[in-house]
Amino acid sequence: MLPSIAKHAALHQVNPLKKHGQNFIFDSSLCDKIVRASNLAENSRVLEIGPGTGGLTRAILQKNPESLTVIETDERCLPLLNEIKEYYPNLNIIKQDALKINLTDLSCDIVNSVGFAYKKREAKPITNRRANDIGESKSIDYKVTIISNLPYHIGTELVIRWLKEAQLITSMTLMLQKEVVERICAIPSTKAYGRLSVICQLIVKVEKCFDVAPTAFYPPPKVYSAIVKLIPLENSPSIALINKVEQITKLAFAGRRKMIKSSLKNLVPNIHEVLTQLKINDNYRAENLAPQDYLRIAEIL
């Protein structure tokens, strides 16, 4: 029988390191709550980034997924995770920096019915052409369910990467800094609304699940966290269009107090005519336009 999460970490002398952005969760009830929020189906193929001491890992495995692949960069955690694997052979452990792995580099083939086969090759950036090729695929052999307590310092970057590979994902249930979750879920004309809100809401359905107090972690961070669930939309825009939206929103929100006709005039010389055609008030500021408004502008460019 496995020891408690905290005792297991102590036995292996695994203490959180700042350089890895580690804040461990020892509360098994919180881990269970996160997994319940994901509505994880049996026989799912799950991906977890940064399992650390394995609290969330255990909660996922108790739901009997077909496989759970964990990506961990901290060598100190590997013996601990391997002990969990002795009880759950459907656990696959990959030592790697999560920022060096794309979902398309995780093969759909199952190795001996356990986890994903990771093709050890240099991780390639998502280019327009490559992403479009992915999006145009007629059939995808597998989809992954992502459940993770993401390190604050890489959380937003990982989310943006995964959005561009959303066709490979069933859902994402993520713990992030509360401020980031509020930005993801923000509606137009609010302070938190920005580029991240626009891009996310064009690609996924967003749902904030619950807040997590700093006291839930060891050591306690200085800020609150929150759980957000992201479910890819069936008919999301192409990567080419999303890249245009990124370009437009970068300019628009750089001067969020400027009127949109001023912010975009260098990118769209006939911006007044475009806004008139789309029936968008040209006195609006960046925060007043809905995600679909930005998409409609991108479609005209």
Swiss-Prot record:
Primary residence: cytoplasm
PROSITE patterns the record matches: RRNA_A_DIMETH, SAM_RNA_A_N6_MT
Residues at which S-adenosyl-L-methionine binds: 23, 25, 50, 72, 97, 149
InterPro entries according to UniProt: KsgA/Erm (IPR001737), RPE2 (IPR022436), rRNA_Ade_diMease-like_C (IPR023165), rRNA_Ade_Mease_Trfase_CS (IPR020596), rRNA_Ade_methylase_Trfase_N (IPR020598), rRNA_adenine_dimethylase (IPR011530), SAM-dependent_MTases_sf (IPR029063)
CDD domains on file: AdoMet_MTases
Catalysis performed (reactions): adenosine(1518)/adenosine(1519) in 16S rRNA + 4 S-adenosyl-L-methionine = N(6)-dimethyladenosine(1518)/N(6)-dimethyladenosine(1519) in 16S rRNA + 4 S-adenosyl-L-homocysteine + 4 H(+)
SMART domains for this protein: rADc
Subcellular location: Cytoplasm
Main enzyme class: transferase
EC numbers, comma separated: 2.1.1.182
Transmembrane segments: none
GO molecular function: 16S rRNA (adenine(1518)-N(6)/adenine(1519)-N(6))-dimethyltransferase activity; RNA binding
Keyword terms: Cytoplasm, Methyltransferase, RNA-binding, rRNA processing, S-adenosyl-L-methionine, Transferase
GO-annotated cellular components: cytoplasm
Xref: Pfam families: RrnaAD (PF00398)
Job description of the protein: Specifically dimethylates two adjacent adenosines (A1518 and A1519) in the loop of a conserved hairpin near the 3'-end of 16S rRNA in the 30S particle. May play a critical role in biogenesis of 30S subunits.
Membership in a protein family: Belongs to the class I-like SAM-binding methyltransferase superfamily. rRNA adenine N(6)-methyltransferase family. RsmA subfamily.
HAMAP family reported for this sequence: 16SrRNA_methyltr_A
Name of protein: Ribosomal RNA small subunit methyltransferase A
Organism field: Rickettsia africae (strain ESF-5)
This protein's encoding gene: rsmA
